[in-house]
């Protein structure tokens, strides 16, 4: 299983390449050349070739998240767990991370679980969505079903902003 934490959780004393190689060094039987190639392939996949000799403190938050993604997929996991992968990122970078997670999930045929409060992410890349309230599953479905949901807790959470409430009213009045 690969994991992406809310903070990128990178080792400050390791370069970008060394951070991605870390799980390979710990858990694979590959030789150094194979591990380096695999890590570079992962960095290429997240568009970070050229940053491999930099340290986490020398790169942006969005780049740090992409390093974390590269590290998480280095061992070709069947499952990927992401805890608030867009935390602290601007909307444009959040969209890049969402698109990257979605395409990697498809490409590597992984099951990806994303824990998030970002409704843009939920609506944009969520395929099977589970809304949990106080530790219990409150609602399950697909993003297209959210707009018409009658679950009060779900709709209160999703439509907390006035703009989203107006959008929902417009959609439900069109039916």
Each model region followed by its residue ranges:
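A short, proline-enriched helix->beta-strand linker immediately N-terminal to the Walker B motif
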Residues: 74-78
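Short helical segment in ABC ATPase nucleotide-binding domains corresponding to the A-loop/adjacent helical element
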Residues: 17-25
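Catalytic Walker B motif of ABC-type/P-loop ATPase nucleotide-binding domains
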Residues: 80-83
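C-terminal boundary and immediately downstream tail of ABC-type ATPase nucleotide-binding domains
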Residues: 144-175
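Conserved ABC ATPase signature
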Residues: 55-59, 63
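Helix N-cap at the start of a conserved alpha-helix in ABC-type nucleotide-binding domains
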Residues: 91-93
